[in-house]
Amino acid sequence: LEFAAGIPGSVGGAVYMNAGAHGSDISRVLVKALILFEDGTIDWLTNEEMAFSYRTSILQNERPGICLEAVLQLEQKERDEIVAQMQKNKDYRKETQPVSNPCAGSIFRNPLPEHAGRLVDEAGLKGHQIGGAKVSEMHGNFIVNAGGATAQDVLDLIAFIQKTIKEKYDIDMHTEVEIIGEKR
């Protein structure tokens, strides 16, 4: 689970969207998850039943629900080795991502084999700002709050990035963040 060090969110959210980093993700360690479905039923789903793929699970579309509990099968390692790998991952995140700025994490899923941040950078969008929402100068796949950003500013900037990448590269950019609630 060392790959997850520094990923913002919860275990339930990580299961919901198959969170991952550094070449691994939740699908590689999940045995089963207890799910509360939209209809109010609660049931265990196995890893296979979760139908994981890149940053998605069955919970996002076919069987909407939330993860209440998760059983994970982790690899046994020496404590020092685990701590060292976690620190390495956190350090990498600090060096390459704007973790000191208010943001929601990675905005777009990587349109494999491309990398979302690289596409945004190559399109010349780093530093582009709408209202208080700004594409990070450090990493193109992050939108930071440059001061007073509203949800609408962020949504407008996301839409602008999607439109620009589609026009320049004919690639559809899908959000990794889940947008819920009112957009104020």
Curated annotation (Swiss-Prot):
BP GO terms, sorted: cell division; cell wall organization; peptidoglycan biosynthetic process; regulation of cell shape
GO cellular component, one term: cytosol
Keywords linked to the UniProt accession: Cell cycle, Cell division, Cell shape, Cell wall biogenesis/degradation, Cytoplasm, FAD, Flavoprotein, NADP, Oxidoreductase, Peptidoglycan synthesis
Catalysed reactions listed for this entry: UDP-N-acetyl-alpha-D-muramate + NADP(+) = UDP-N-acetyl-3-O-(1-carboxyvinyl)-alpha-D-glucosamine + NADPH + H(+)
UniProt-annotated catalytic positions: 55, 106 (proton donor), 176
Principal EC category: oxidoreductase
EC number in record: 1.3.1.98
Pathway: Cell wall biogenesis; peptidoglycan biosynthesis
Protein's cellular compartments: Cytoplasm
GO molecular function: flavin adenine dinucleotide binding; UDP-N-acetylmuramate dehydrogenase activity
Needed co-factor(s): FAD
SUPFAM superfamilies referenced in this protein's UniProt entry, alphabetically: FAD-binding/transporter-associated domain-like, Uridine diphospho-N-Acetylenolpyruvylglucosamine reductase, MurB, C-terminal domain
Superkingdom to which the source organism belongs: Bacteria
Similarity comment: Belongs to the MurB family.
Role noted for this protein: Cell wall formation.
Protein name in the entry: UDP-N-acetylenolpyruvoylglucosamine reductase
Organism: Bacillus licheniformis
